[in-house]
């Protein structure tokens, strides 16, 4: 298992660099991540690296117990770290819904779908969670506003790491305020791109 853990660690490190190496790779990653939005970032990276087309992933026990679906014989799991901090060298395996089949106890798998009738409630919840949103003319605009608010509120927690990450890059010579502004724009634009892929 330690050998496989090392291979997945290498894959993770390589993928971390690859997804940010150019805009096309970042967009490709976002296209994968928007389908598995409940996963941690490290899990999303590893799903992208191993099965970028995965639409809904769970562990085998969850497929069986929660949805009454059985994993197909010979299906290959998607290896992810068991815990985010990697304090233990342990992997967990996810399987995509396409790797499963229904049983007589199957329940419908809720693939994320936004209905028009919930739009006002969702916008209200976004505003109560992330603060006042300037443009609420559509759900997409409200989500963009919420993403900007969240980036603005949370960026102080990440600034030191962000400045450290600029060492050795073209951003090293750029003023810290500009780096922070670029980061906020990347977050907001990434959210917008993901939303355009899930057709809100």
Model-derived features: positions:
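N-terminal accessory/interface modules of nucleic-acid-binding and processing proteins
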Residues: 1-198
């Amino acid at each position: 298992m330690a050998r496989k853990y090392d291979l997945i660690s290498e894959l993770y490190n390589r993928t971390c660099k690859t997804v940010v190496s150019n805009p096309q790779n970042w967009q490709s990653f976002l296209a994968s991540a928007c389908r598995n939005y409940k996963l941690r970032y490290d899990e999303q990276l590893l799903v992208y690296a191993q099965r970028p087309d995965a639409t809904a992933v769970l562990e085998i026990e969850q497929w069986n117990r929660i949805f009454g679906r059985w994993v197909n014989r010979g299906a290959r799991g998607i290896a992810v770290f068991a815990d985010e901090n990697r304090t233990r060298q342990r992997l967990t395996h996810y399987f995509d819904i396409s790797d499963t089949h229904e049983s007589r106890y199957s329940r419908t798998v809720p693939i994320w779908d936004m209905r028009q009738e919930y739009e006002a409630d969702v916008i209200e919840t976004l505003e109560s969670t992330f603060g006042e949103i300037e443009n609420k003319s559509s759900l997409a605009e409200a989500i963009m506003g919420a993403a900007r608010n969240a980036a603005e509120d949370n960026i102080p927690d990440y600034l030191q790491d962000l400045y450290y990450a600029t060492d050795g890059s073209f951003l090293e010579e750029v003023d810290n305020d500009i780096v922070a502004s670029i980061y906020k724009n990347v977050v907001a634009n990434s959210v917008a791109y993901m939303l355009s892929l899930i057709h809100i």
